[in-house]
């Protein structure tokens, strides 16, 4: 069997687990943890091998710009983010680098997901989301989007927006995406104020919609703001997810 045939057989045998819309940034150099500690919503002390954490980079007003997973890789940190915004995120982080000897660059490898199984570690936002790990790229995962939305979990630029949605309105508190004990970071003041006053007036929720005619309903403030219409089969009835109901009880 030739090299091309061998490679084709190998790829066909690989499980369909790669999240092809994700990319990895590697932050290394002079204390990357300390660099990120003053920027992101997550406490970098909790980012240890085998325990990635979900967090965000906010505006000074506490609105989401980027969300991502943070992975420990030796002394470096891997940022698992949307591929479409990876370059923009790298540029944004570089603004804060100043003269610190920090490198921010694309990393090889791919992000993988499986709904269940022994591979990887539980998604830090919600264990029901499944397992997540980093490895060589393979066949594209199937079912991730529908599974995530069926659990009422939002992520990414299209759903969270950029400088549109306050971080706690993204359900960051309920999905373990913020530390209230770590100290200062960009957007911390407004985020902490909302938390301590227990005042989150709006929240992102996932609800199935009908055909395009239902788009007009989103123009009425009393019905809420629809950030994006996505067609996904078998989402089920609109409801407050169990994890959110339990957190708000």
Describe the role of every protein-language-model region.
Residues 2-249:
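Basic, glycine/lysine-rich polyanion-binding surfaces/domains
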């Amino acid at each position: 069997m030739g090299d091309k045939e061998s490679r084709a057989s190998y790829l066909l045998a690989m499980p369909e687990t790669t999240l092809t819309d994700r990319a990895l940034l590697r932050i290394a150099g002079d204390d990357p943890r300390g660099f990120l500690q003053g920027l992101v919503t997550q406490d970098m002390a909790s980012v240890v091998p085998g325990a990635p954490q979900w967090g965000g980079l906010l505006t000074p007003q506490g609105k989401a710009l980027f969300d991502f997973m943070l992975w420990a890789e030796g002394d470096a940190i891997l940022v698992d983010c949307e591929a479409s915004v990876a370059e923009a995120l790298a540029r944004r982080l570089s603004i804060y680098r100043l003269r610190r000897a920090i490198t921010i660059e694309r990393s090889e490898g791919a992000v993988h997901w499986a709904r269940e199984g022994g591979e990887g570690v539980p998604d830090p936002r919600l264990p029901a989301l499944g397992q997540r790990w980093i490895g060589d790229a393979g066949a594209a995962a199937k079912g991730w989007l529908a599974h995530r939305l069926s659990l009422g979990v939002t992520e990414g630029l299209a759903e969270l927006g950029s400088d549109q949605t306050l971080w706690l309105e993204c359900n960051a508190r309920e999905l373990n995406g913020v530390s209230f004990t770590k100290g200062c970071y960009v957007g911390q003041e407004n985020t902490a104020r909302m938390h301590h006053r227990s005042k989150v007036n709006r929240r992102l929720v996932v609800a199935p919609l009908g055909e395009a005619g239902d788009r007009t309903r989103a123009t009425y403030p009393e019905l809420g703001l629809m950030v994006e219409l996505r067609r996904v089969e078998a989402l089920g009835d609109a409801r407050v997810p169990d994890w959110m109901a339990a957190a708000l009880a």
